[in-house]
């Protein structure tokens, strides 16, 4: 996990956008963190989903902010009522204790972009990382669109960082099932045509994860983050990532769907074989991901 030393919130800065109503704080290590409370309105599995999702992405080499369990004290909550959760019935006091905290990427004058104009897509580095992220999200039962922010460097290039994993593993309450298209990035222009080498690398990366080590990683999480439904959904995710044939089927479905929707070139010259008539095979159906694609 991301660090072992305990840190705690020392300064409330502001509330942020989002269904989980996160807040921005300065922590005892001097850094800024986006904090999500355990009793957020989205569901009890959110801290688990955020932390384990970050760990899977890190294991795949996908960029994202570092995270840590962050202690929020009763005195901090009571002295900063602006951080309380807004509900239709009024303000709800956040629960104290260990919360999910991810390092804030917007400090030190960094220019961050959430939505890209059409002219900016050519400036994005690592387009293929979005394909790998989509594959991981499908295996993890992501029930929402993939979120990413883009950090602009001095030369104008944009580096993607993947954020907001709270809807992995069937969502913050668990058990939510959506079609596999629900988990892709909203603007399909980010998915550029893959070379055969990139195609193979994506499957190899996802299929090469040490799932035993990933499972052991949950031991470091706070006990109350590990709900029964979250653990069950996570076990299913690791099972999918261990099935090489299933991964191939999912990748074929992804490629077929984007080629159909975007009018991309057919796949024969790209991969040296015809796309399957029905990419979805029984193995994919068994994942209950509701993937459908007909070439």
What residue ranges belong to the model's regions?
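C-terminal catalytic region of ATP-dependent kinase domains
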Residues: 38, 155-295
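Conserved aromatic-histidine-acidic binding/catalytic patches
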Residues: 41, 45, 127, 226
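Conserved ATP-binding subdomain of kinase catalytic cores across diverse folds
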Residues: 2-113, 137-143, 158, 165
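Short secondary-structure transition/capping segments
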Residues: 107-121, 190-194
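Conserved kinase catalytic-core segment
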Residues: 113-174
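N-terminal intrinsically disordered, low-complexity tails enriched in polar/charged
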Residues: 1-11, 284-293
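A general structural signal for short secondary-structure boundary/capping elements
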Residues: 71-72, 145-150, 206-213
């Amino acid at each position: 996990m991301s660090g072992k030393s305990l840190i705690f919130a020392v300064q409330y800065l502001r509330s942020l956008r989002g269904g989980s109503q996160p807040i921005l704080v300065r922590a005892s290590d001097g850094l800024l963190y986006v904090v999500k409370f355990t009793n957020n309105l989205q569901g009890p599995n959110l801290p688990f989903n955020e932390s384990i999702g970050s760990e899977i992405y890190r294991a795949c080499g996908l960029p994202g902010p570092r995270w840590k369990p962050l202690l929020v004290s009763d005195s901090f909550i009571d002295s900063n009522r602006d951080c309380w959760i807004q509900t239709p019935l009024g303000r709800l006091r956040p629960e104290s204790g260990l919360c999910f905290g991810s390092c804030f990427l917007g400090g030190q004058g960094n220019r961050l972009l959430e939505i890209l104009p059409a002219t900016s897509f050519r400036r994005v580095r690592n387009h293929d990382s979005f394909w790998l992220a989509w594959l991981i999200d499908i295996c993890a039962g992501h029930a929402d669109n993939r979120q990413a922010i883009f950090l602009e460097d001095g030369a104008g290039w944009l580096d993607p960082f993947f954020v907001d994993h709270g809807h992995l593993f069937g969502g913050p309450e668990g058990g939510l099932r959506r079609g596999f298209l629900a988990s892709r990035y909203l603007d399909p222009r980010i998915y550029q045509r893959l070379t055969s080498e990139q195609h193979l690398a994506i499957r190899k990366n996802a299929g090469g994860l040490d799932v035993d080590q990933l499972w052991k990683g949950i031991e470091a999480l706070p006990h109350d983050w590990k709900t029964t439904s979250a653990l069950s959904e996570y076990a299913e995710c690791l099972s999918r990532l261990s099935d090489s044939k299933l991964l191939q089927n999912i990748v074929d479905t992804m490629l077929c769907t984007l080629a159909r929707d975007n009018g991309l070139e057919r796949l024969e010259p790209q991969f040296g074989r015809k796309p399957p008539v029905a990419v979805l095979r029984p193995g994919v159906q068994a994942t209950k991901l509701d993937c459908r694609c007909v070439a």
